């Protein structure tokens, strides 16, 4: 995914805590991410088979669990999502949601997600926010 590595590395060097919240199992994620060692910068992961997880996406629990483990408020978290269930989960948790899609969010989704077609847009916004405040 274009700009993913730059976004993760920027967060890492800036000291921004990160979590990977996924419906995939630990084994599936290990397989999918093996070719991308830069993902090891993400210090926390909540997998679909996490033993503490009682409900998966679209329930808000995966994002709430990640925020709890990072010791931050979910409302201070930026969630990047590419699925309806993930978007619904992040919105219900109170995260600020960025939907990665070529099409805008459907009207039935609550909250105020931003639809972008590239993580480059998210990176630019993050840099802008971190340099302005």
Regions found by a protein language model. Name each.
Residues 1-20, 26-30:
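Short, acidic loop-to-helix structural element flanking the phosphoryl-transfer center
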Residues 9, 26, 30-133:
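Asp-based, Mg2+/Mn2+-dependent phosphohydrolase catalytic module
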């Amino acid at each position: 995914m274009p700009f993913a590595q730059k976004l993760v590395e920027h967060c890492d060097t800036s000291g921004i805590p990160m979590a990977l919240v996924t419906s995939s199992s630990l084994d599936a994620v290990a397989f999918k991410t093996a070719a991308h060692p830069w993902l090891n910068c993400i210090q926390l992961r909540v997998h679909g088979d996490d033993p503490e997880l009682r409900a998966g996406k679209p329930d808000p629990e995966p994002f709430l669990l990640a925020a709890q483990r990072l010791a931050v408020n979910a409302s201070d978290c930026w969630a990047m999502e590419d699925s309806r269930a993930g978007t619904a989960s992040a919105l219900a948790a109170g995260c600020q949601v960025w939907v990665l899609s070529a099409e805008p969010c459907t009207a039935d989704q609550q909250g105020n997600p931003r639809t972008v077609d590239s993580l480059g847009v998210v990176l630019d916004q993050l840099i802008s926010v971190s340099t302005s405040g």
